[in-house]
Regions:
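Alpha-helical transmembrane segments in inner-membrane proteins
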Residues: 4-363
Length: 363
């Protein structure tokens, strides 16, 4: 515990020095940083557009770009038009929403806990969603994605509330350390309960394992419609909290001296993370790695300023999830590899390389 507390304090001090150095930089240096941030955001936007086009064009049947544009803007009911508009556009839309939500949630959770290795799963979102989906299958006979969405979202919300309540026990309210400990405890309990249910019922296990792998396949536009308002609400709350999160990253005492309510800021952050990660998990199943590594990638050009880091993380998360989905369609064509598997296979080694090469900017 002492070692972890020392690590968090050291990370907070490093971040504070970085922010103060940036604020004290000469005008030309600040102007150069702003240009680099704008260039980075523009590059991410271009990559996201390219990923969207690739997601629509690539699949068991490849569709040329002129066919993609024809289906998007002047459809005539051809086979390619039906494939694009009925199958690949909803899948791409959901990938953008879910990837952006996970990237943004990852940046928020790392900022609120001051833990560079935190991801949305720290609040028990994935395990809460999984447990409620298993209960929905086992106790209520839910067998379709539309039913999974609401059970998963309810589970993610319940787990986050439990973590926040447990982490708030005591005079100091929720702190990075208490939230991390509460999240680990709640996640372990929910994982054990989920395993107990699937082990005693084979049919529940068969239905659950297809959802648990994490995928964009088979999701229709109605799935995105079910979660879009939760995603938008979470994004608005998260983006609006950027100035307060900058102050909070300098330490709770500094944030209070600057006029911010630490408890309110952290509470709103948990609400935003729950809405974002819970909705994405409900729609696509548990998807790892995106919320963990995306903030580290974009910090290379945004720096520690959350006014830039949060929108950049959303763009990068959407692009990363779509590109992983495209790779999954290509490597085992005409079949496909689920996006959750692709991210686990590619993302784990990449993150290790990122840390080893010291490309991860201190939070």
């Amino acid at each position: 515990m002492r070692g972890k507390t020392h690590y968090l304090a050291k990370a907070s001090l490093t971040y504070g020095v970085t922010v103060l150095t940036t604020l004290a930089a000469p005008a030309p240096a600040v102007g150069g940083l702003r240009r680099r941030r704008l260039a980075g955001l523009a590059l991410l936007a271009v990559v996201l557009v390219a990923a969207c086009l690739a997601s629509i064009a690539v699949g068991a049947k490849a569709i040329p770009l002129d066919g993609v544009f024809h289906a998007l803007f002047t459809p005539t009911g051809t086979e390619d038009d039906i494939v694009v508009r009925s199958l690949r556009m909803p899948r791409t839309l959901l990938g953008v929403l879910a990837g952006g939500a996970l990237g943004l949630a990852g940046a928020l959770i790392q900022g609120h806990t001051r833990n560079p290795l935190a991801d949305p799963g720290l609040l028990g979102v994935n395990n809460g969603a999984a447990f409620f989906v298993v209960i929905g299958i086992y106790a209520f006979g839910v067998t379709n994605l539309y039913g999974y969405v609401w059970f998963a979202f309810a589970g993610a919300l319940a787990a986050s509330v439990a973590v926040f309540v447990l982490g708030s026990v005591g005079r100091g309210g929720p702190t990075p350390v208490t939230l991390a400990l509460a999240g680990a405890a709640v996640s372990a309990l929910l994982a054990a309960l989920t395993s107990a249910v699937v082990l005693i019922d084979v049919q529940t296990l068969d239905a659950y394992r297809f959802w648990a792998v994490g995928s964009l396949a088979g999701r229709e536009v109605e799935i995105a419609g079910q979660v879009q308002w939760f995603l938008f609400a979470g994004a608005l709350i998260g983006l609006a909290s950027a100035p307060a999160l900058n102050a909070l990253s300098l330490g709770d005492d500094v944030a209070r001296s600057l006029g911010h309510s630490v408890r309110r800021t952290r509470t709103m952050g948990i609400v935003a993370i729950t809405l974002l990660a819970g909705s994405a998990t409900a729609a696509c199943g548990p998807i790892a790695f995106v919320g963990l590594v995306v903030p580290h990638i974009v910090r290379s050009f945004t720096g520690p300023d959350y006014r830039w880091l949060l929108p950049a993380s959303a763009l990068a998360g959407a692009a990363l999830l779509l590109l992983a989905d495209v790779i999954g369609r290509v490597v085992v064509r005409p079949g496909e590899l689920q996006v959750g598997i692709v991210l686990a296979l590619v993302g784990g080694p990449f993150f290790i390389w990122l840390v080893r090469r010291r490309k991860m900017v201190a939070i």
